[in-house]
Amino acid sequence: MKQLLDFLPLIIFFAVYKFFDIYIASGALIAATALQLVVTYALYKKLEKMHLITFAMVTVFGTLTLVFHDDAFIKWKVTIIYALFALALGVSQLLNKSILKSMLGKEMKVADKIWAHVTWYWVSFFAICGLVNIYVAFRLPLETWVNFKVFGLTALTLINTVITVFYLYKHLPEDQRKELK
């Protein structure tokens, strides 16, 4: 259920874009992200920082897109969110307070060195996605960017998540690996 809620704004954005245009889709994205927060809080009685940051970015850049009738703002939102994620992960790792370890470390007991590898992998991933988004958003047609944002970035994120899980699994202690089989 939680994963469906995470994808709800993206699905609504894509569907509304296909039937209308980028401006109506941007307004729908703002509304869907707000709805996501309300439903998430109603079901789980808490909100993650990532959801709040995403909502703030969607609201700011979506509103700018609507007010100035310029799709560049909603396109930049993707890169800025990825840059913030990369920055947060990188700074936390430099301070020896891995965000990924704090999120997953209770379930996956691996060495700090492995958490550092995973963190820098995701920093690189987010940075590269942000840069590729700039290229696709401003060098290719709007339709291509929307498809890239919805399908390309989602697929890349899922693939990288699977790669990360396999990498972490490989470095789990033997007794914990047996528990997962």
UniProtKB/Swiss-Prot annotation:
Membrane spanning residue stretches: 10-30, 50-70, 72-92, 118-138, 148-168
Membrane association type: Multi-pass membrane protein
Main location class: membrane
Keywords: Cell inner membrane, Cell membrane, Membrane, Transmembrane, Transmembrane helix
Localization in the cell: Cell inner membrane
GO cellular component terms, A-Z: plasma membrane
InterPro entries xref list: YciB (IPR006008)
Role noted for this protein: Plays a role in cell envelope biogenesis, maintenance of cell envelope integrity and membrane homeostasis.
Family: Belongs to the YciB family.
Protein's name according to its UniProt entry: Inner membrane-spanning protein YciB
Species of provenance: Shewanella sp. (strain ANA-3)
